[in-house]
């Protein structure tokens, strides 16, 4: 018979979702997976201590704020609707063109959803 052996040094003995406050704790304090929709942050400073320039570019490319809520379809659609309403109320021609492009994209998305629903029924 084979046995499953846990490895406490990599933290797989307690796999459970945790809150954002618990994410600030160090690895010895917690052995859990982040909540659904949140990425597992890489430890670049520890893994690649010599790549200073790449690390500074990575810090510039990944801002401190995140949009985890946009992974959910309803939140994404709501944010797109508010963005479109802001763009259509502006007086700038560039923003009006962006609103028209966003409207075309939303129409295409709705058409693809209709086609997908029809394919499921067939």
Swiss-Prot record:
<keyword id="KW-0964">Secreted</keyword>
<dbReference type="GO" id="GO:0005576">
    <property type="term" value="C:extracellular region"/>
</dbReference>
<comment type="subunit">
    <text>Interacts with YscY.</text>
</comment>
<protein>
    <recommendedName>
        <fullName>Yop proteins translocation protein X</fullName>
    </recommendedName>
</protein>
<dbReference type="Pfam" id="PF09474">
    <property type="entry name" value="Type_III_YscX"/>
</dbReference>
<comment type="function">
    <text>Required for Yop secretion.</text>
</comment>
<keyword id="KW-0175">Coiled coil</keyword>
<dbReference type="InterPro" id="IPR012672">
    <property type="entry name" value="T3SS_YscX"/>
</dbReference>
<keyword id="KW-0614">Plasmid</keyword>
<feature type="coiled-coil region">
    <location>
        <begin position="71"/>
        <end position="87"/>
    </location>
</feature>
């Amino acid at each position: 018979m084979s046995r499953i052996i846990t490895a406490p040094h990599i933290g797989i003995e307690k796999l459970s979702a945790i809150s954002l406050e618990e994410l600030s704790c160090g690895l010895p304090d917690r052995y859990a997976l982040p909540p659904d929709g949140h990425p597992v942050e890489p430890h670049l400073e520890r893994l690649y201590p010599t790549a200073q320039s790449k690390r500074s570019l990575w810090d510039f490319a990944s801002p401190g704020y995140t949009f985890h809520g946009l992974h959910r379809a309803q939140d994404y659609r709501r944010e797109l609707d508010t963005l479109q309403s802001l763009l259509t109320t502006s007086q700038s021609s560039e923003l009006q063109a962006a609103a028209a492009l966003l409207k075309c994209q939303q129409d295409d998305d709705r058409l693809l959803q209709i086609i997908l629903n029809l394919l499921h029924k067939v």
